[in-house]
Amino acid sequence: MLLPKRVKYRRQHRPKTTGRSKGGNYVTFGEYGLQATTTSWITSRQIESARIAMTRYMKRGGKVWIKIFPHTPYTKKPLEVRMGAGKGAVEGWIAVVKPGRILFEVAGVSEEVAREALRLASHKLPVKTKFVKREELGGETNES
């Protein structure tokens, strides 16, 4: 499971979940990607579950990049505890995902295999997603 090695502060305020993603909106490493179309928190367990689903379907062929990381801690107080007495203990780690963010990238497999692997991964996540291909910058190449 993914979690930071060390953090400056153990507990944080809850992050904003409005607007579109500022960065990470393009497929940069692989050939195909899984792009979020809605906003949600994704836990480190959900990321790991999606990764396992993809790699098992691809039978360890190709390469998978995880483009999100759960930096943000979320806290929870125990059941049946009255309000007050400080903030609760850290329950887990989340990545805030906004529309437009690329979650996973895949390379080294055919488009059909990549599409199905990313579809299986999307079923493990709490966001709506779409399959995207890499867009080359600059348009045509000048080879004469």
From Swiss-Prot:
Give the Gene Ontology MF terms in alphabetical order.
rRNA binding; structural constituent of ribosome; tRNA binding
Compositionally biased region (Basic residues) = 1-19
DNA repair listed as a keyword: no
Q: Name one GO biological process term.
A: translation
Q: Which Pfam families match?
A: Ribosomal_L16
Q: Does the keyword RNA-binding apply?
A: yes
Q: Which domain of life is it from?
A: Bacteria
One CC-aspect GO term: cytosolic large ribosomal subunit
Region Disordered, as annotated, extends over: 1-23
Listed A to Z, the keywords are: Ribonucleoprotein, Ribosomal protein, RNA-binding, rRNA-binding, tRNA-binding
Record InterPro entries: Ribosomal_uL16 (IPR047873), Ribosomal_uL16_bact-type (IPR000114), Ribosomal_uL16_CS (IPR020798), Ribosomal_uL16_dom (IPR016180), Ribosomal_uL16_sf (IPR036920)
PANTHER family named in the record: 50S/60S RIBOSOMAL PROTEIN L16, LARGE RIBOSOMAL SUBUNIT PROTEIN UL16M
Describe, as the record does, how this protein assembles with itself and its partners.
Part of the 50S ribosomal subunit.
Reported function:
Binds 23S rRNA and is also seen to make contacts with the A and possibly P site tRNAs.
The entry's family comment says: Belongs to the universal ribosomal protein uL16 family.
Could you identify this protein by its name? Large ribosomal subunit protein uL16
Its lineage reads: Bacteria, Bacillati, Bacillota, Bacilli, Bacillales
